[in-house]
Amino acid sequence: MPSHIARLLRRALGAALVPAISSILWVTAAAAHADYPVDYNFFSGIPYELRNPGGSLPGADDWSCRPSDAHPEPVVLVHGTGGGAQTNWGVYAPLLANEGYCVYSLTYGAYDLPWPLSAIGGMRPIEDSSAQLAAFVDRVLAATSAAKVDLIAHSQGNLVGNYFVKRLGGSDKVDKFVAIAAPWLGTFGPVIDPARDFARRLGAGPAFDATLGASPCAACAQMTGSADFIRSLNADGVYDPEVTYTNIETRYDELVVPYTVALVPGPKTTNIVVQDGCAADYSEHAGIAGSDRAAAFALNALDPDDPQPVPCHFIPPITG
């Protein structure tokens, strides 16, 4: 074959291969970064737990994930009372992964019992759960080589996260803390605190506290009103001065009562009530962790330099 014809063939072949290879690479990259389905429903994670007990949600717990320059901190999800790694975060794990975050979720505070009881987290004392979170964060930092993580927590998970931050060395490991329905000052204080004070005046304070703590949920008593745990954790202020907090709360919270205990002012703290500017949002304690409106506020708290529109439409209670 003449050399000039061979050169023409090589050029033609190269011209054909470049777009073909580019197409293959594009398809491969698209598959690697394919969007995970996001079902805005607080209970959307439960089917994953039923199908794969103790597993991970789509987009979560990829230990080979490396944070990008746009999102340098991995996000750790900290569930609420009775929740778990999958059951609490059916919305947030795939949503964050789609946004390009490395996202991780654990089940803390569960009893060492067979499934499905092993999937019910947030039962043990908060101090024990915080130690589990501390170990998990260390694992995330080691795997991703990140300097810090961001936390998104729901309900009791906020106290677990804050105890880690303030008492277990987490201040140097957490950058942003997004707190959904956080019982910072204890819950049901107006109801429980007068009864607790009366019992203490009668010398029955320990018996009163023991009665509150008699349920399988040891953490539940720690979150009530001015319980010893709450008073001790907040003795030096609610927040850690090195961490940026965003509180997201609903006026219809039936478990964090009054809802204003989730909105404590602070120097590096932003307080958001989801009904402000959107009267159609009827989410309550569970639904707020399933709604797209609250999720948009959370995304903007993680990345305030690239804010996304926050939707406003009818959001039902319970599911969000």
Segments (PLM) and residue ranges:
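Second-shell loop/turn segments in exported
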Residues: 80-83, 117-124, 218-219, 282-288
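Conserved alpha/beta-hydrolase
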Residues: 96-115
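Short N-terminal helix/helix-N-cap motif within the alpha/beta-hydrolase-1
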Residues: 85-87, 113, 188
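Composition-driven, intrinsically disordered low-complexity tracts enriched in small residues
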Residues: 31-56, 65, 142, 190-214, ...
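Extracytoplasmic/secreted proteins, especially bacterial periplasmic and envelope-associated proteins
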Residues: 73, 87, 91, 98, ...
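Flexible, membrane-associating and regulatory peripheral segments of lipid-active enzymes
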Residues: 2-98, 313-320
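C-terminal catalytic-base region of ester-bond hydrolases, centering on the histidine
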Residues: 199-201, 238-320
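Serine-dependent carboxylesterase/thioesterase catalytic core
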Residues: 79, 103, 126-233
